[in-house]
Regions:
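P-loop NTPase motor core
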Residues: 101-156, 161, 366, 379-388, ...
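Conserved Walker B
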Residues: 17, 318-323, 350
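Conserved P-loop NTP-binding catalytic core
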Residues: 43-58, 62-64, 71-122, 128-129
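C-terminal lobe/lid and adjacent interdomain/linker elements of RecA-like ASCE P-loop ATPase modules
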Residues: 2-8, 330-422
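Pre-Walker A-like glycine/lysine-rich segment at the N-terminus of P-loop NTPase domains
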Residues: 2-76, 421
Length: 422
């Protein structure tokens, strides 16, 4: 990617997905903070078009508050862009609206504001579990908002510039398909650009160990991966890739297309092996013999280093699971050290809510409301909170609400174990 081109996630809004009832907004535009602490954290932001943009946003809160539902919703909506061009009529979309208060009869909506190759786009859609109701795409080619298309039901309106022969695409778009997804597959220029942003720039999770790209990514980033393992006091001194020939069962159909059996076919099997300082000549199988923490940091870094070097955005749910706190901070610091990459993550680790590491606007609290729905709000919204205060302590004491309420005493738990509580 050219050095002067910027890609950036600016904001996401979600409404009526899973435990999300009322609209929530995650904003990567930095707040108006001019404190000495914010100046010390200048690496946590980058500039685009006169605005400061956050490199990281963390979602904190108790179990079952909805952190993972936020990530699941974003993943679903992005997959709709990538995959809905192949949807058939009659498909039921893979999400559920909020179940209570009649919201299961209301539509759900998604909105994303982002920058792709220095141009800002606003894309949104509204849907039920069986059809697309509305969809729109706007952009700012000269810092002025312009329509590319807008869709309400089966009716479309188009801007004066944008997608070539737009009505032709509309005629080929069903009620279960996003217009953007269909247009991208027909090679329409702006639609293809936006589609590639979702495919290549806004990454939704971690690379899998058997992914074809993992070997090349590992070879490119081996030095820094080994450095990260040193941070967590690992005694791994080397990692190597081995290829073996193997066999896998492949279904064999009959002439009428029915499966009648399996045939063993040769395949290439890629395995990672680790070597440890105390016995550097003995290989260990990475997937079966290394700790969950080692495997976790490996898969995160493989993806995140690509993100950091190529100005991409990424989201990771429970990113510090099975990870030492120092290593979690190493990952955060890696993003802050990049030019303009971004990370959206969820965590239970209260130690990360640290004003020496994060600005107030980088920390979001996710809480369950009385009606069971998910609420999201930023530490920046607490105007009486100063960066000199202990944010971790305040969080654990319930000052920001998003902590589990545990009222059971040891005596109560003893009664519970004895079956004495009815």
């Amino acid at each position: 990617m050219e050095k002067n081109l910027i890609n950036a996630l600016l904001a996401i809004e979600l409404e009526n997905f899973f435990s999300i009832k009322n609209k929530i907004r995650l904003d990567f535009r930095a707040g108006n903070i001019h404190t000495a602490s914010a100046k010390m954290l200048s690496d946590n932001v980058f500039e685009w078009n006169g605005q400061k943009i956050l490199k990281t946003v963390g979602l904190f809160g108790p179990n079952a508050a909805g952190k993972s539902n936020i990530m699941k919703t974003i993943n679903f909506c992005c997959r709709m862009v990538l995959d809905s061009h192949a949807h058939n009529q009659g498909i039921v979309f893979n999400f559920k609206p909020f179940k209570f208060d009649g919201w299961d009869q209301k539509p759900s909506s998604f909105y994303i504001d982002f920058v792709c190759e220095n141009i800002e786009y606003e894309y949104s859609f509204k849907l039920t579990t069986t059809e697309i109701l509305e969809e729109s795409l706007y952009y700012y080619p000269n810092n002025r908002k312009a329509k590319i298309f807008e869709r309400k039901g089966s009716k479309y309106t188009f801007g004066t510039k944008g997608i070539n022969r737009p009505a032709e695409v509309a005629n080929d778009t069903s009620s279960t398909q996003l217009y953007l997804s269909v247009a991208s597959q027909k090679g329409r220029n702006i639609a293809k650009t936006v589609y590639l942003y979702f495919l290549q720039t806004f990454l939704l999770g971690l690379v899998q160990m058997q992914d074809a790209s993992i070997e090349n990514l590992f070879k490119q980033e081996k030095k820094i991966i080994m450095k990260a393992l040193e941070v967590c006091d690992s005694d791994i001194c080397d990692i190597a890739v081995e290829h073996k020939k193997g066999f896998a069962p492949v279904p064999t159909p009959s002439l009428d297309g029915q499966q009648i059996g399996f045939q063993m076919q040769p395949i290439d099997i890629m395995r990672f092996h680790t070597y440890h300082r105390n016995n550097p000549n003995i290989p260990f199988d990475f997937e079966t013999e290394e700790s969950n923490g080692t495997k976790r940091i490996f898969t995160i870094l493989i993806r995140l280093l690509d993100v950091a070097r190529n100005k991409k955005s990424m989201m990771i749910d429970e990113f510090d699971t099975s990870m030492h706190p120092h290593l979690a901070q190493f990952v955060i610091d890696l993003v802050h050290a990049s030019e303009s990459s971004q990370l959206l993550f969820t965590s239970h680790n209260a130690a990360l809510i640290d004003m020496d590491r994060f600005r107030k606007d980088q920390i979001y609290f996710i809480n369950k409301k009385v009606d069971g729905s998910t609420d999201a709000y930023s530490l920046y919204d607490f105007k009486d909170f100063r960066e000199t205060m202990d944010a971790t302590k305040g969080y654990l004491q319930g000052r920001f609400d998003a902590v589990p309420i545990i009222t059971s005493s040891v005596a109560t738990l003893k009664q519970l174990l004895k079956g004495g509580i009815k």
